[in-house]
Amino acid sequence: MTDSRTLAYTNMYAVLGTLENLCELDDKAKEIISTIEKPISVAFDVKNGPSATLTFSKNGCRMDDGVNADCDIKIPVANCDKFNGIIDGKVTPIPTKGLTKVNFLLKTFTALTDRLTEVMRPSEEALKDTDFFRLNTLCTFYTVSVALSQIGNQDAIGKFSASNIVDG
């Protein structure tokens, strides 16, 4: 059985958080963000779940915990299941702030998340390219590392397991 709250935290911080690494490591992602004229931020606020703000500039992407009051685009989400549906592409997010900047979501943000999907769910053929294989490995490592942290912090069994691990 899937714990939708734990999955939402994993999707927020591990999956969307990997956009930071993608924008730093991948030439195609760098090309996508190179068109950004001034920094733009997108905040996701999940009721009874995670909230974070992603800020994009031509120099990269940064994720901050919580909703920045001065974010350009705010996307409130009713619950963790809806947020997981957004990540799966089954639910369409509706911004309550920044409707004039929706073009960023439809073009740049979508292009970045499509590229992230391409990197994280590669074809066998793509993995034959050593540079792509390296990018996939680095992004996967980052995603898994953060996912483990979220599971340890959010999931009941994960919390129990984490509590039995000696610090250090």
Features from the language model and the residues they span:
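Feature captures hydrophobic
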Residues: 1-167
